[in-house]
Amino acid sequence: MAHVLRAPGSPYSVQRILKPIYKTCVCHLLNLHRSHNAQKGDGSCEFEAFQSGHCSGTMLDVVRGIQAQIGLEPGYYTIPKCRANLLKYQPERKDLPERSMKDSFTTAVLPLSTIPIRERYVNHLGLVRMGRLMEELDLFAVWICHRHLCIPTLPKGIPVPYNFFTFLYDSVDFTNINEISAFEDIELCGHVSWTGNSSMELTIYMRQKMRTVAKAIIMMVARNATNTRSAPVNALKPANEEEQLCFENSIERQKKRTAKKSKSVLNVKPTSSDEQLMYETFKRTRGTDALSVNMPVKLPPNCKWMSESFQTTMLHAFPENRNSNNYIFAGFVMRTAVEISFIAACIHAGGRPLIQCIMDVAFYRPLKVNSFLKVTAYVVYTFERYIQLLTIVQALDANSMVKITTNVLHLTYKAEGKVKEVLPSSYQETLWYINGRNKFAAFQNLRGTRKVDKKSQKTVRTGEK
């Protein structure tokens, strides 16, 4: 579940943000942006077909909305308040009405144009902290889940007997990333694009100055009030042709996700082409004399060993990073992983590369609030100006000292110039190298096939040479 326990950064920003007149102005500006895009007819607004006119205000309003939905009381308790009394309100799937994509569609604004808010999201160069944006993205995803949920039998005033958790980030594709300003508001908008029995796929956009800067596909899961079992969600029924097309694309993604997991080189035996790549890499570093036992390993020119291309850190999470179940919320994990990955990419590139994509972010286990976090970012593949990273998050229980892997992320960065090639020196590293190569190919495919609003009959190809 997303972070809904944070305190506002400044009392002045809170007063300004929560003023109804400011919220009205925000929504009015969003409508102007949409009208502008419609008049341009350039297909830049992929989500126009799902507009519902609903505006949730600012991201602080979103936080308060989630708190009100789940009946969250202020204060930290080592044992969260029992919600077992809400189990009797848990509906059956048949009692939940069907919902369309417009029902869950909403917009919210991250008001970076206000100075007190901006300070939280800016780095020392005056640029936007991408890790902070990932926190807001995760929070907004939970809000969309609440928007989709409709329980006709729930009495008025009773908290929603649900918990929503991040299950998977299929992809976060960044565009116009070098033009994101820390002095302009960022708009988040999105909707549910597919549902299972207790799972939902969400499509979310981040926009600034009427331009899309990121598109995310996220999988969320619903749990009951006590987080002891899955909970059913409203079935999604497309309301028109555009929603039907989006729904069909989501079904295809779901099939690909299942197939991708079963074909990963980290889970199954390498293919013949993978083995050929292993052999070619071996020859590059060992030479042709394979009979020499004590032959020194040779590093080709302008290359670097994978074993030397990583950065790691240990963190102690605190209650301020928790969700209502006293687990570390997914947004904090995403922010931390993105920031450590950026450091690893910077050191390898010798500059400040720009993030291009995050994909296949797995959430294996929840992180307890008393956990120590070990985050390690490995450079596993490079191609010209691109750097592919594998970032692993491990939890170390503060009591038992048992270490478990909780998250795995795959990130792509682009440097200003050509970077050193990274090469593996062990079998495990070679598997990571092949997997990184496959992830980079998936990123290229994502960039090469990105499509926009069908009505415009245009396809934007932003793959870079």
Language-model features: where?
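N-terminal chloroplast transit peptides
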Residues: 1-18
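HotDog/MaoC-like acyl-thioester-processing domains
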Residues: 31, 37-86, 178-184, 189-270, ...
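Catalytic strand-loop segment that frames the active site of acyl-thioester-processing enzymes
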Residues: 43-129, 243-330, 448-465
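Intrinsic-disorder/low-complexity, polar/charged segments enriched in Ser/Thr/Lys/Arg/Asp/Glu/Gln
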Residues: 100-107, 132, 185-187, 201, ...
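Single-stranded nucleic-acid-binding OB-fold domains
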Residues: 126, 130, 146-167, 177-180, ...
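Active-site helix/loop of acyl-thioester processing domains in fatty-acid/polyketide metabolism
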Residues: 128-159, 331-353
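A cross-kingdom feature marking solvent-exposed beta-strand/loop segments within repeated
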Residues: 154-187, 350-374
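C-terminal, well-structured subdomains that either form a transmembrane helix-short loop-helix hairpin
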Residues: 324, 332-337, 341, 353-385
